[in-house]
Amino acid sequence: MSLRYAPLSTTRRPALAPKLVAVLAAVVVLLSGWASEASGGPRADWVGTWASVPTATPASSTPVVDNETVRQIVHTSVGGSELRLRLTNEFGAAPLRIGDVHVARRAAGTTIDPRTDRQVTFAGSPTVTIPAGAPMLSDPIRLALPPRTDLVVSIYLPARTPVTTLHGFAYQENVIAAGNVADDRTVTATRTVTQWFFLSGVSVRGHAQSVVALGDSITNGFETDINANHRWPDLFAARARGTGVLNLGVAGNRLLHDPNPPPGSDAEGYAAFFGESALRRFDRDVLAQPGVSQVIVLLGVNDLGHPGTTAPIEETVTAEEIIGAHKQLVARAHAAGLTIHGGTILPFKGDTLGFYNEANEAKRRQVNHWIRTSGTYDSVIDFDRVMRDPADPQRLNPTYDSGDHLHPNDAGMAAMANAIPTRLF
């Protein structure tokens, strides 16, 4: 727990006798020496270097992998001397059988550097069966990982496997190849996908700490260039050196509601990718991350815009309800000893998704005023002020607009990353 939340005591305690103090000091030194000898020196903790939000797959479009290898690329943040993977079968209805897993640093494209290839084991075994609904941590893997590295994770699935757990918006091209080619330098792709299958985290051994970016499609990187790693958390990681930056943004995510597409709507085909509400997923996606010490929250625009578009109009929320959800995130972060920073909601007048109306704009301004002035968050990152059009503050600055008037382009992502003071981390 952070010392910032430790209560101060003014109770006077009786002084210890000098001889007793000397004896206790000697014992502490002796025990410290034993601990260092047993561990081979000061122990480094695990810290997250990459993460994604696992979501369910729409029933109408569930991919299937059968005697195939899924080769996936993730872009890490902080480096370390060892790493471990976190796989997940969270939304699976049956056990997930994995026949082989390899990791390596990327050479180019989906080609690996064979000198860095390592087989991944689970309790010493190269195969693992993950129970339905469960995650699975790998054994530590001896592989030095420099900061901001492209890591290739190859997972072989020997039997017919519906991909029921994935991250739907990776903005990264990954490939599927026939057979077990997990340790091959290059693979012949039979399919290209832009999701991450069954993979939710990479952690490294080191002395760093991590910050979670908890958000929606703007944090997830919607409308950024594929394979470019231009999401604002990626760009911030280049500035926050020595800190793990974990992108726990997911497109379409809301603070207060899970996905609930109207029957018969187009949203039925993709709404599952929106993920569980931030209030529901906070413990898994924030508190359970290894080495996490801080959180940046940028959420609320979908709570305003989804009702009546991709969710029932009955799920319309008030500004007070959005503020109440933010207060709950802050309370839970502080209870865990974390520092939490509030991001103001970006403007979206004229958006092409049908989110904007005067009522939603009034709610956005009310929520942003509360974030800025209430003192509830430990600090405020005023994304709204950075991203708005000086000539029309209800709109995105055209320089930063992807074209849908809601999501930033790559230049906008860079502006958001630069708006975060590195002194906070």
Which sequence ranges carry the predicted segments?
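Conserved SGNH/GDSL esterase-like catalytic core that processes O-acyl groups on lipids
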Residues: W50, D66-Q72, P95, V101-G109, ...
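Catalytic His-Asp segment of secreted/periplasmic serine-dependent ester chemistry enzymes
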Residues: R254, N260-D266, G305, I345-F425
